Amino acid sequence: MADMRNLVERLERVVGRLEAVSHASDTHCGYGDSAAKAGTTPYVQAFDSLLAGPVAEYLKISKEIGGDVQKHAEMVHTGLKLERALLVTASQCQQPAGNKLSDLLAPISEQIQEVVTFREKNRGSKLFNHLSAVSESIQALGWVAMAPKPGPYVKEMNDAAMFYTNRVLKEYKDVDKKHVDWVKAYLSIWTELQAYIKEFHTTGLAWSRTGPVAKELSGLPSGPSAGSGPPPPPPGPPPPPVPTSSGSDDSASRSALFAQINQGESITHALKHVSDDMKTHKNPALKAQSGLIRSGPKPFSASKPDPPKPVAKKEPALLELEGKKWRVENQENVSNLMIEDTELKQVAYIFKCVNSTLQIKGKINSITVDNCKKLGLVFDDVVGIVEIINSKDVKVQVMGKVPTISINKTDGCHVYLSKNSLDCEIVSAKSSEMNVLIPTEGGDFNEFPVPEQFKTLWNGQKLVTTVTEIAG
């Protein structure tokens, strides 16, 4: 009897283990299922080290700065936590097919968009350069979808951030060291991430080769996933059953049909004569009784036009001094914009101006032209830098002196230099149709194009880049 009891207990233990294995295999392998097993793989542990190191330092300094920078940092932190959850999922599950993979990546993608949108909604922020540095580089979180070279993609995003972090350094290096430390902490996130990818995910996110296939998101620790929609509606009723008939019925029907066809013209003898009182077109009473009868296809009718799309809300035009920043925004078809009474510590930010002309008198610290079209800018003296970004067909004229003009992501830019600004440095990137006009003794200008095409060669020790001369 004791042997029988021991045998039953052993069988119960075996069944329990089998049920546990079965439950683990059927688990819906999403973010939420991974939380309890975090840190079981080396690359999840390494990512945790990144979160505890540069990310924690970035969050700490952002909190000290406060305001928009702190809010932005919290959004970035959410994106990194979503990425960690995906890494845990990948360490336990096999990679799903295309559509299912998109579902898994959707929360990260939406969080990236939220970070970018925050910057666009706060263009008037005093910490706009901080927000821009984050917004331009947050796309680096998308490395999980990049193959076979996710590392270089992150580096490219890091380089994009440096365009704005350099501004932060220039503005705060002698004013507040906290902002300098913020730049170092933020950029170190992406440099550390590059090293992490190189070690664990060189050719793309490393998925498990065993375990269940990862499915759509469900059960995020913070609540329902951002990317999941409402449950699908219940399926409709099944189609009515197709009437069935026996083989003998089909055979009989076919035989009857062929018999009628073989009758030839004699088949018309079975037709009944239709008298005039039975014809609709000859019997008005019958026509009124039966209503409109249409034979043949419906006549062509033009499709209804789509409802007009709502017109985008037009932002109000601005020309105002906010603190130490002149804001010139959303000006259209205005040819006499003027900024006077400037001070050395003031800056000018010109955004989304179209077919307009602005003159800035006096000496100012810096000027930024962002997302403008057909803008004419005339200024006296700038002690820092004039930057033209994301613009098209811009003309800039220097009346006094400026040390540096930067042209970035711009198509069509004419720079008219004065005699006092001939030593100006012109830095360009990702731009085209740039021309510098040099004054002559007669008061005219000679036009010189800025090179756009380059040739790079390996000389045995390093890459050597030269301007490509095109004979015309």
Curated annotation (Swiss-Prot):
The modification Phosphotyrosine is found at Y31. Residues 218-228, 244-253 have a biased composition (Low complexity). Its main location: membrane. It is found in: Cell membrane. The modification N-acetylalanine is found at A2. Homodimer. Binds actin monomers. Directly regulates filament dynamics and has been implicated in a number of complex developmental and morphological processes, including mRNA localization and the establishment of cell polarity. This is Adenylyl cyclase-associated protein 1.
